[in-house]
Amino acid sequence: MDESSLPTPFRIALEHLREKTQAEARVDAVCNNFAYVWVSDLRKANAEAPPGGWIRLPTAFPFGNPHGLVTTEPLKREDGSRVTDAHHPNHDMCKPVQSLGGANYYSWTWQDCPPIRDPRDIVGVLQWYERRIRRG
């Protein structure tokens, strides 16, 4: 995907994410003003889980909040049971990355979270998703 067409603040956020934690982060799709950002090192609660996932970021980031996560396999807790909170298998939100294996949508929103004010807040977004996965 040609990232040069994305808004400057979004590109700054993506570059910061690559520099700080996710060197392989990339945008695999854009649909309805949301970019599907692949993060290969997304830490999951269960060590046997396949790595990575797509964070749905508005192309207006940081002026719009993240909304959802797409994974190839259902997320599991440390005990091996499935994370069912806001889990939607084969949801329409998976379609932009379905050909890459996206099959499980978690409709986690940024409600009641710290305000995002800067493109560099992207690292905190990733950490928030990892905490949410651990909590199940």
Model regions: which residues?
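UBC/E2-like fold recognition across ubiquitin and ubiquitin-like conjugation systems
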Residues: 1-50, 60-136
